[in-house]
Amino acid sequence: MSNRKLQKEIDIIFKKIQEGLQDFDYHYERYESIQNTEDDSDNQREKEKLANDLKKEIKKLQKFREQIKHWLQNDTVHTLGPVGTSYESKLAENKSLIEDSMETYKLVEKQSKLKTFSNQSIMMTFMDSTNGDDDDDDDDSDDDELFSGSDEDEEDEYSDLPEDAVNAIHFFKDSILQLREQTHKLDHEYEKLAAKKLRKNNLATIEAKKEKIQSTIGNNKFHQKKLKKLLRQLTSGVVTEFNLIWLLKDDLNKYLESNGDYEFTRETELYDDIFNQIAAVEEDYSEIHEDNHDHSHSHLEKTSTANGTHHESATTTATAAKNSSVTTRTSPSPILTKANGHIKELSVESGSPTTSRSKLSKIHTNTSQSSTHSNTSSSTHAQAPRQSPELTSPAIVKTLRPATAPSKPVGTLKWSAAAAAAIPDVQEKPELVETESNGSSVHKTVSKDQYEEKINYQSPAPTQQQQQPQTSVESKTLSTTQSLASSITDNINLDKYKEVIKNSNLTKTELGLFSDMNLARVPPGIQDLVISFASKRNNDNFKVLVDSTEFNQFALPLHKPYLPEIVQPSYYSQYTSTSFKHPTPLVKFQSYWNQVRANFGFQKLMDEIKSLTLQNNADNLPIIAELTFVLFYGFYYGVTPAENLIAESYLFELGWKPYKNQSEDGSNNLSTGSISLSDINGSKSKSNRSSNYYFWFKRVKLISRGEDMGQPSNIEFGDYQVFDLSFWEIFVKYGFKFDYNFCQMEPSKTLF
């Protein structure tokens, strides 16, 4: 009877395992399909959701796996089922399927921990593409290639390698063989323990031994895979530095001598350091090779014009003038001709058209002769194309450049479109070179009027039909950009914030800088650049800007006296030596705040908070708190004073009011362990306003007013939501005695 009950339980578990595997495969297929698409914000959120779903499914499957392991240790499993069938094999098969899913989830977990365009992600992609992504292969199929050659073949193969590389190859091959032998012994020992009958007195000991054996086997396989990768690098001859190789050799010796007891597990970063060092050396070599190639090519061009001797070409003067005119239009940079090592530079800003034309024709003739000679002399030397780093190469980290701004906005107004609307077109002045009769070259800078006249003289003016489409496209782009920008700013009154800044007794530089509301919209990098330039004017009367004497890439040159010291942008550099750690979720709020301020979407954020509040649903409370934290982030950590003022006004609109820390006045009504200004600076703050912003209160329920309780009229009792800056949290205080004398009743009219 008990066997039938056990068999029924196993069948139920089998059914649940199949359902769990189907759900896991379904989520993983969706995850893989999104993984191959572009990494925009929507896809990123979907990938995170699918990763969480996969985590839930794998946890269920792991519970079933533990149950299967328990059943496999039971002898009654061998007698279950009809004759010719064995439940033991079915249990082992299901256990194997679950373990395959666990390995798949490890890949998902590894990918989810890496940022899309981080240096680590790019480097790992590069290493996988060059070394082979065989971290998850448990077979030894490639061992035959590593150990198949004879001693004579190996000597011929390694003849070009340095002695250190050959010694390392032999040592690592021996190490792989020893690791394989130890793994086989551990597998045999594990099978013996698994077949041993379990009793209460030896159950814990056997399980501990099995876990230790499994851990050692995993470490052995890890070292084998990494050593195979390293052997490929050594045999290819790309390893030039052996310091880390010898460190690895010492650790491997200790690990092999102790049969895996030495603490050299898969958590080590020594292999990654070695591979990164190899990649860095390859990158440096490629850059040096390219520089040498460019230098040699330029040296050939210079020698062709040395000592002032030129070979006359068979081309006519008209053909030479035509070729040189094309060169002048396509490349505004001058072609310098050397003679006896002397170069003359002459700046010509004015002159008659006739003189300019005669000189221009002379320039064309001499330039064509020198260019024809250089082309003839260098034709025998095939110039190799300059190689650019691949997307998977670590060199791409150093050569990444910002993308150019699009000609017109696509969809909603972007950073680049808003910036491009205010950039005027600048026409550079081309430089031309005239070769004098005595062999020395004359370097001339031609004025804009002369250049336009020369261009018109050489090529006919474009027709009206050619000019009209370009003009219409430019006007359409400008009108579209301006209309989008105006529609964005229509829903917010910026004048009241400008008025507050004007009333703040700022210096002329600060007033002009912070009164520009566009500074509150641009990306953080542009804000940093503009504020850093303004702070270098060294005005002793600055109220907000700071000229820091030390460079700190993580701090802005700002100090806002109207905010607490612990949230100052330059808090780490010169104002205090204490260590205040910002809460981790601020990164998320920073991203949300940057999106909101980019298109002045503050009212949209307000409407969302209000609509969720009106629903009176308890499930919406975490979402409301998250959105409110975004406004608090803008108030405390917004870069410009305009951002702080905008966030403050919307917090007041939601019913939040700053409340002074009463511990400074002898009362301890807020016992939340907050940090006072006296604790930070050692004395009272000079600005009383900054002490008001450690707490914000929002009334949830009014219990009674002060008059009803025999208290002054400025007192009331109720339930309040409280935002605590020191802990960055919102909690509720019930039956709190609220004193309006410690409360700011309306948004700020001035910064100080």
Swiss-Prot record:
Skewed-composition ranges (Low complexity): 365-384, 459-472
Localization of this protein: Cytoplasm; Nucleus
Biased composition (Acidic residues): 131-160
Keyword Isomerase appears in the UniProt entry: no
Region annotation (Disordered) ranges: 126-160, 289-394, 459-478
Ranges in a coiled coil: 173-230
Record field: compositional bias (Polar residues): 322-334, 349-358
Disruption phenotype: Decreases cell adherence to silicone substrate. Decreases slightly filamentation.
Subunit (UniProt): Component of the NOT protein complex.
Any one GO BP annotation for this protein: regulation of transcription by RNA polymerase II
Basic and acidic residues bias: start-end ranges: 289-302
UniProt-listed PANTHER family: CCR4 NOT-RELATED
UniProt GO cellular component terms: CCR4-NOT core complex; nucleus; P-body
Record InterPro entries: Not2/3/5, Not_N
Protein family according to the UniProt entry: Belongs to the CNOT2/3/5 family.
Protein name in the entry: General negative regulator of transcription subunit 3
Biological source species: Candida albicans (strain SC5314 / ATCC MYA-2876) (Yeast)
Keywords from the UniProt entry: Activator, Coiled coil, Cytoplasm, Nucleus, Repressor, Transcription, Transcription regulation
Domain of life, source organism: Eukaryota
Keyword Coiled coil annotated: yes
Purpose: Acts as a component of the CCR4-NOT core complex, which in the nucleus seems to be a general transcription factor, and in the cytoplasm the major mRNA deadenylase involved in mRNA turnover. The NOT protein subcomplex negatively regulates the basal and activated transcription of many genes. Preferentially affects TC-type TATA element-dependent transcription. Could directly or indirectly inhibit component(s) of the general transcription machinery.
